[in-house]
Amino acid sequence: MAKDPVRVLVTGAAGQIGYALVPMIARGVMLGADQPVILHMLDIPPAAEALNGVKMELVDAAFPLLKGVVATTDAVEACTGVNVAVMVGGFPRKEGMERKDVMSKNVSIYKSQASALEKHAAPNCKVLVVANPANTNALILKEYAPSIPEKNISCLTRLDHNRALGQISERLNVQVSDVKNVIIWGNHSSSQYPDVNHATVATPAGEKPVRELVADDAWLNGEFISTVQQRGAAIIKARKLSSALSAASSACDHIRDWVLGTPEGTWVSMGVYSDGSYNVPAGLIYSFPVACKNGEWSIVQGLPIDEFSRKKLDATAEELSEEKALAYSCLT
């Protein structure tokens, strides 16, 4: 029997991540090849014409799974009845701007979108925040949408997770699908900690630890970490635009695994509301290793954390606590 369509909201839909993301959703990359979707696209009034152009292209692409398109500049209309919300819209930092100025712009955006989602989205709506500062934007959204369960609000660190998988696969010259269980801890910023201590590679002789196969701790503890941390900046330098294709693809991965589940024995990285696991302060949106089942994530528990890792986990938590304080200071 045909499934009922799922309503998926993309904010900032006329932007370049939105432009890469909506065809992926319409093709079934996010929710599966048998799941019809209705796309809700929101952007700001100056982008209304461009947004309409994206809608025209979606019609022209004749996607079999796409059962409808709502393109609007009205947050209430955009949020009404949505089951999944991918928050790509935000205020990007421009040259010469202070962090606090950017933060205050994003706080006001996420405050108003939180209330639209809370009042109008479907009851069990899953929310993914992509716009930077992603962790803190998600935290503001959570604060201003108290009736949305905290387990339904997340931010994107799957892009960093996939970047880490990609670096290992290139270094070892193996298929990226054979590498698993890297972890991104903390903030989606250059303070994040890409951790390979529990990661493995499928080989003809069974699963082997990444550390053993790479056999170069200096690289794994140095250049590997900084490459993943700085990858976004490297892409901007090369493309003169921020990473859009990879961000869109990882947003699909994040939602797909959350809704449809992670394979047995595999975990992924998601920015979720901290409950104090791994001695990370509660009350932050922090990236953890998670496994997903029946539409719910749970933090993978009991992984040993060495001294090197502990320092990194604490440093990124500290940055998130500072961001949280800065965001709250914008609320007054």
From Swiss-Prot:
GO biological process, one term: malate metabolic process
Catalytic activity: (S)-malate + NAD(+) = oxaloacetate + NADH + H(+)
Pfam families: Ldh_1_C (PF02866), Ldh_1_N (PF00056)
Binding site for NAD(+): Q16, I17, D43, G90, Q113, N132
GO MF assignments: L-malate dehydrogenase (NAD+) activity
Binding-site residues, oxaloacetate: R99, N132, R163, H188, S243
UniProt keyword Ligase present: no
Name under which the protein is recorded: Malate dehydrogenase
Disulphide linkage map: none
Function: Catalyzes the reduction of the carbonyl group of oxalacetic acid. No activity with pulegone.
Catalytic-site annotation from UniProt: H188
One GO cellular component term noted in the UniProt record for this chain: cytoplasm
Subcellular location: Cytoplasm
Main EC class the enzyme belongs to: oxidoreductase
Main location (coarse class): cytoplasm
InterPro entries, per database record: L-lactate/malate_DH (IPR001557), Lactate/malate_DH_C (IPR022383), Lactate/malate_DH_N (IPR001236), Lactate_DH/Glyco_Ohase_4_C (IPR015955), Malate_DH_AS (IPR001252), Malate_DH_NAD-dep_euk (IPR011274), Malate_DH_type2 (IPR010945), NAD(P)-bd_dom_sf (IPR036291)
Organism: Nicotiana tabacum (Common tobacco)
Protein origin, superkingdom: Eukaryota
Keyword vocabulary terms for this entry: Cytoplasm, NAD, Oxidoreductase, Tricarboxylic acid cycle
Protein EC: 1.1.1.37
Similarity remark: Belongs to the LDH/MDH superfamily. MDH type 2 family.
UniProt subunit comment: Homodimer.
Listed Gene3D superfamilies: Lactate dehydrogenase/glycoside hydrolase, family 4, C-terminal, NAD(P)-binding Rossmann-like Domain
